[in-house]
Amino acid sequence: GKVRLGFHQVTRPEGNNTLEDYASNARGMNVIVPTWFNVVSSDGTYTSLASKDYVDKAHDMGLKVWAMVENVSTEESVKNLNTKTLMSSTSTRKKLIEKLMNEADTYGFDGFNLDFESLKAEAGPHYVQFIREMSVACRNKGLVLSVDNYVPSSYTAFYNRKEQGIVADY
């Protein structure tokens, strides 16, 4: 069926308690993307607002949960994270992906949504490689992988949407 997705901005743990209010105003929505994982440093460290109760409640409401992994929602991530450094290291990518797959096991959500913004061109190929590797890990676990992108333009061509379209589900 069609994906009718809504983003749920969760900025602190209490934000998870607003799922029912939020979803009640979004008739027809069948996927919710809570903003749970903020990558805050170039070694792949991230903060988590994930909640098993949220996932269980969403599932009871007939919603799939695709947890967002992003790099821009906090001052800490904007200040400390060099995405090229993070993404250009094979071992760091592998460690980050393994940790994220463990989160999926722990919380029981249905997929991931990647939202990496403000990348510099030199980070582009490494980010695409991360998406490839994340795609394999997600497929092995039966998880969906979706990627958020800018409107296509010449100055964001390095996001390589064509390759993303091959390896990501959405």
Give names to the regions the model predicted.
Residues 1-6, 16-25:
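Non-catalytic propeptide/linker segments at domain boundaries
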Residues 2-13, 38-170:
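Chitinase-like catalytic core of GlcNAc-active glycosidases
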Residues 25-26, 167:
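Short, conserved loop/helix-junction motifs that constitute active-site signature segments
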